[in-house]
Every structure is written in structure tokens, then in C-alpha cells.
Swiss-Prot record:
K(+) binds at E51. PANTHER family: S-ADENOSYLMETHIONINE SYNTHETASE (PTHR11964). L-methionine binds at E64, Q108, D251, K282. Its cofactor is Mg(2+); K(+). Signal peptide: none annotated. This is S-adenosylmethionine synthase. It is an enzyme of class 2 (transferase). InterPro entries: ADOMET_SYNTHASE_CS (IPR022631), S-AdoMet_synt_C (IPR022630), S-AdoMet_synt_central (IPR022629), S-AdoMet_synt_N (IPR022628), S-AdoMet_synthetase (IPR002133), S-AdoMet_synthetase_sfam (IPR022636). The lineage of its organism: Bacteria, Pseudomonadati, Pseudomonadota, Alphaproteobacteria, Hyphomicrobiales.
Length: 398
């Protein structure tokens, strides 16, 4: 790998049209997991695959679900409006109160269910994966959260601005925004920022790019290591000159279109499957979380400075078809040894992953913006895949 190079990653805010859709889809997943226990429905039996489209004053939700009858269209619509309100959309072209919401959800296909539901009373085999696919996990020691620096700081910039907007400190900024950070690497380590891009919606129509920069620059500087921003750093703030029309009114959104923002900012491979709107029987989501968990614990254990981990599954088959680890020349143990010990340390069947990471819970809406990885595990079970509780187990097993 080259020692000196530039690498760029982007992030988008919760008000970006695609992220609005991710949020809505994940709110519906959470609704099923919240309502299930109240109705006596086993959380292991809940299924949700929800896709959302959002455009000018219109939201369309389609997909397949299984769960309590208490999850009515009226309840779903209420959750959707609350999510849009929380994001902050009260503009003429997209308002939480007046947007037209179409809900087109129907039961999960019986052909899919027969493979996924194998672990029901009387069955003689394990619960299978909800689909075929490949999933990647990645970790590196560039940041405290063991994430690549470019995506870590791109998220942090927008998260700080969002917090200020929600607190009322930045009332002139709208919900829709994007960031991009170009990081300079020397000897394979991040040492500075070459270019910064922030495009941010503003609620006063005639605000100039310079006026927007006055608002956002303090948060950019707060997010980045102080020594990384110098007089040689190039800034691009609202480079088109105007960003007044934002959100789904300015650009239609869809669930699952920001998979690189959701993961590692392009610093690691991606299997192609999106996360939002999917319950954890879908290995696109749960196995990607498991892969991150294992890669992070390998790095946290000091067994590698960088780790890429791939899992592969087939629909209706419980065990992963393959486990692959690449430590990019930084490993302190042979990669085939690491592959063996991670498979011994964690049950990587869909059911095993759900149990180990406690995924049958309403924890998904919080993942829908600012990345699924590099986050702090919370007391409600969110981001359990970011724990490093397996590090000592792996270290002892080598």
C-alpha cells in the first residue's frame, strides 16, 4: 500500500432525501419490535422489509411484514409523520403535517418464510438466512472508534451541526446537508485535511455561501483535530452558491441508496446490500453488523492494525458458506488462525448473530443517519456490534 496519498469520504445528514427514507423504513422496523411484545408476539417471529420513496409532499412505503395486528396503517402513518417532524421538515414542498403518505405493506412471501422459519416448533433444522449475499466488516486503528478517519470526521462534522440545529442554536440552517473530507496520509497514517466540502440547506433564501460558512465553520473546526486544518486546507462551502430548496422536495429519496455512507466511506469493500428497513433475519444487515463486530474486536485485541472480514450466506442455509479475513500485512497472527478463532468465538448463524448481538429490539431508527459503525453502544441495546467484549477472548485464543 502506498505510504503517501489522499483519501476522501462523504457523509449526509438525517435530512438528506435518502436518509429521510432510511429513517422512515427503520422506524417501521422498530414499530414492529415495539408492538410485538405488547401483543404477545414472539420477537423471533417478527419480519419487516420496508422500502420508502419520498418526493414533493409524498411518501410511499412498500414491502413485506409479519407481526402484531396492532401495527395498523394509522399507527404507521403516525410514526412516519413523527419522524419527518423530528428531522425538521416544515417547508411548503415537504411538511410532516401535510405530506401524502401511501402505505403498501403486505405479508412476507411464504417461499421465503419456509427457509427462514425452519426453527419453529417441530422443525428439525436451524433457522436459515433470509437471503444469499456477501457482507463485509472492517476496522482500523486510525480513530478511537476504530474507523477510517475520512468517514469518521465527515460524520462528526454533520452530527455537530445537526445537534446545534436541533438545539435552536442554528435556526437558519435546514435539515438537508452533505459533507466530504479529503484526508492526507503519510506512511499510511492520517496526518491532515487537504479539502473540506460542506453543502448545507439554509432557510433564508438569500444567504450567501460566505454567510453559510460563518455558520458551519466552527463546527467543522471542532470536529477535526486542530493541527489537521491549516492555511493550506481548501474549503468548499455551498459551492453552487445556493441551497434553499432541500430534502425530498429538491431531490427524490429512496431507502438504501447511501450504503457507503452507512459503512466505511469507501475504505473497505461492500457486499451491496443495504441495511435500513430490514429486520435482523436479513443477513444483509445482521451479518454486516457481525462482520464489523468481529473485525473491530480483532483490532481492539491488538491482533491487527487493519482488518477486513467477509461472510457469505445462502438463503435458507444457516451456517455461513465462507469466512475470510485480510489484515493487510498488519496481522499479529496468521489470517487462517483468525478465521478459525472468530468462528469458534461467535455463532455466525442468523439466529446466533441475533442472539449474541441482541438484535430483536427496536434499535434501528437511531442507526439511519451518521453511520451504522463507529457509534457508541447505548443502554437500550443500540449499536451492540460496536462493543469490544470479545477482544480478550480472541487474544487468548491465538
Amino acid at each position: 500500500m502506498r505510504g503517501s496519498y489522499l483519501f476522501t469520504s462523504e457523509s449526509v445528514s438525517e435530512g438528506h432525501p435518502d436518509k429521510v427514507c432510511d429513517r422512515i423504513s427503520d422506524e417501521i422496523v422498530d414499530l414492529f419490535f415495539s408492538e410485538g411484545p405488547k401483543a404477545g408476539v414472539d420477537p423471533w417471529a417478527i419480519r419487516a422489509a420496508c422500502e420508502t420513496l419520498a418526493t414533493t409532499n409524498k411518501v410511499v412505503i412498500a414491502g413485506e411484514t409479519r407481526g402484531p395486528e396492532s401495527v395498523t396503517k394509522e399507527k404507521i402513518e403516525s410514526v412516519v409523520r413523527a419522524a419527518i417532524k423530528d428531522i425538521g421538515y416544515e417547508q411548503d414542498g415537504f411538511h410532516w403535517k401535510t405530506a401524502d403518505i401511501d402505505i403498501l405493506l403486505h405479508p412476507q412471501s411464504a417461499d421465503i418464510a419456509q427457509g427462514v422459519d425452519a426453527l419453529q416448533p417441530g422443525a428439525n433444522k436451524e433457522e436459515g438466512a433470509g437471503d444469499q449475499g456477501i457482507m463485509f466488516g472492517y476496522a482500523c486503528n486510525e480513530t478511537p472508534d476504530l474507523m477510517p478517519a475520512p468517514i469518521f470526521y465527515a460524520h462528526k462534522i454533520l452530527r455537530l451541526i445537526s445537534e446545534a440545529r436541533h438545539s435552536g442554536k442554528e435556526k437558519v440552517l435546514g435539515p438537508d446537508s452533505k459533507s466530504q473530507v479529503t484526508v492526507q496520509y503519510e506512511n499510511g497514517k492520517p496526518v491532515g485535511v487537504r479539502e473540506i466540502v460542506v453543502s448545507h440547506q439554509h432557510l433564508i433564501e438569500d444567504m450567501s455561501s460566505d454567510q453559510v460558512r460563518e455558520r458551519v465553520e466552527p463546527y467543522v473546526r471542532e470536529a477535526l483535530p486542530k493541527a489537521w486544518v491549516t492555511d493550506k486546507t481548501i474549503w468548499h462551502i455551498n459551492p453552487t452558491g445556493k441551497f434553499f430548496i432541500g430534502g425530498p422536495d429538491g431531490d427524490a429519496g429512496l431507502t438504501g441508496r447511501k450504503i457507503i455512507v452507512d459503512t466505511y466511506g469507501g475504505a473497505a469493500p461492500h457486499g451491496g446490500g443495504a441495511f435500513s428497513g430490514k429486520d435482523p433475519t436479513k443477513v444483509d444487515r445482521s451479518a454486516a453488523y457481525a462482520a464489523r463486530y468481529l473485525a473491530k474486536n480483532i483490532v481492539a485485541a491488538g491482533l491487527a492494525d487493519r482488518c477486513t472480514l467477509q461472510l457469505a450466506y445462502a438463503i435458507g442455509v444457516a451456517r455461513p458458506l465462507s469466512i475470510y479475513i485480510d489484515t493487510h500485512g498488519t496481522g499479529k497472527a496468521p489470517e487462517d488462525t483468525l478465521e478459525r478463532i472468530v468462528s469458534e468465538a461467535m455463532d455466525l448463524t442468523p439466529r446466533g448473530i441475533r442472539k449474541h448481538l441482541d438484535l430483536n429490539r427496536p434499535i434501528y431508527a437511531r442507526t439511519s443517519s451518521y453511520g451504522h459503525f463507529g457509534r457508541t453502544p447505548d443502554n437500550e441495546g443500540g449499536f451492540s456490534w460496536e462493543k469490544t467484549d470479545l477482544a480478550e477472548v480472541l487474544k487468548r485464543a491465538v
